[in-house]
Design a protein with these regions (language model features):
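Short, compositionally biased serine/threonine- and acidic-rich segments at solvent-exposed termini, linkers
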Residues: 78, 190-222
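N-terminal exported-region signature
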Residues: 1-185, 191-195, 199, 259
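Glycine-centered coil/turn sites that cap beta-strands in beta-rich domains
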Residues: 217-231, 235-257, 265-266
Length: 269
C-alpha cells in the first residue's frame, strides 16, 4: 500500500477498481525521491503526520502530460515526494492540518521563465536548505513534457543550462524579468543553433525543440564604433576614456597635440 507506479496505455479510457476503502496508511519513505499514492479519499499534504519532519516542503508533484505541483493526494493517482532521510509518514482520513500551507512561488521576487505551466526562477540567491524545495523529481518517461535547469532544479542564480523534453516541434516560453542582469548586461537565452534571445521586461518567444538551452548574463553589444567623452573633464591629473566596438577588432588610441604631434598612445591591441 502507498506505492505509486508509471502506467502507459495505448488508448484513453477508464476502469472501476473494487476493494476495501483505505482510511489510514503508513508509508515508508526512502531518502530522496519516492513514488507514492494516497487513501481512498482526497488528503492534503499538510494533514499528513510526519513525526520525523522528513518530507521536504514543496516537493509533492503529480503528473498531467508533465509534472505539476500538488498539495492534495487524489485517489488512484501517483505522486513524487522527496524526503530528507528515510522514515515513515502516516496518512489518516479526515485528519486536520498538521502544518501551515506555504507558498513557494517566487513570482514577483525573482526573474521567471514559464513553460507549459512550469515556472523556472533565476537571478536571486536562496539558502541551501530552501534550494531543496525547488528540486524536481526524476525525469518522466519519453513522450512526456519536461523542462528544468540542469541539476534537476527549477531555480538558478545566473548562468545555467535548461534541459527540455518535448514531444512537439516547438514550444512557447513566457518570461518576466524584474531583476536586471547588471550594468551594460542583459539576460540572454541561447539555443544550440547559436540563436540568441534577449530577455527584457515581459514577453513570449516560440522556439524549436532542442535538448538544451543556455541562460546567462551577457554584455550588451554596441551597434556602432564609439569613442566617448573623457571623464572627468577638465581633469588633474587623471581622466578616463571609454570606447565601444560592435565586434572584436584591433584598437589603437593615440593622443595628439594641437600641432598634430603624437603625445601618447593609450591603447594598441
Amino acid at each position: 500500500h502507498g506505492e505509486g507506479y508509471w502506467l502507459r496505455f495505448e488508448n484513453t479510457g477508464s476502469t472501476t477498481i473494487d476493494g476495501t476503502p483505505i482510511n489510514e496508511l503508513t508509508i515508508s519513505l526512502n531518502e530522496d525521491w519516492n513514488l507514492v499514492s494516497g487513501l481512498s479519499e482526497d488528503i492534503s499534504i499538510y494533514s499528513i503526520s510526519d513525526p520525523g519532519s522528513i518530507i521536504i516542503p514543496g516537493t509533492l508533484y503529480g503528473f498531467n502530460e508533465g509534472y505539476v505541483e500538488a498539495d492534495i493526494l487524489v485517489p488512484g493517482k501517483g505522486y513524487w515526494v522527496r524526503a530528507f532521510v528515510a522514515g515513515e509518514i502516516i496518512l489518516t482520513s479526515g485528519a486536520l492540518a498538521k502544518t501551515a500551507p506555504r507558498d513557494f512561488s517566487l513570482k514577483g521576487k525573482a526573474n521567471s521563465l514559464t513553460v507549459n505551466g512550469m515556472d523556472l526562477y533565476f537571478g536571486v540567491e536562496i539558502s541551501a536548505s530552501d534550494k531543496l524545495s525547488y528540486s524536481l523529481p526524476p525525469k518522466p518517461p519519453l513522450g512526456a513534457f519536461d523542462v528544468r535547469f540542469s541539476g534537476d532544479t527549477k531555480i538558478a542564480m545566473d548562468k545555467a543550462e535548461i534541459e527540455v523534453m518535448n514531444p512537439s516541434q516547438t514550444f512557447t516560453i513566457s518570461y518576466d524579468i524584474i531583476i536586471d542582469a547588471g550594468e551594460h548586461m542583459n539576460w540572454v537565452l541561447s539555443t544550440g543553433n547559436s540563436e540568441e534571445y534577449t530577455l527584457e521586461g515581459t514577453g513570449e518567444i516560440t522556439v524549436s525543440t532542442e535538448e538544451t538551452f543556455t541562460l546567462e548574463r551577457k554584455a550588451i553589444m554596441p551597434i556602432s564604433y564609439t569613442l566617448h567623452q573623457n571623464y572627468p573633464n577638465p581633469f588633474n591629473p587623471n581622466t578616463s576614456l571609454y570606447y565601444d566596438l560592435p565586434e572584436q577588432a584591433q584598437v589603437t588610441l593615440t593622443i595628439y597635440n594641437m600641432l598634430g604631434r603624437e603625445v601618447a598612445q593609450l591603447v594598441n591591441t
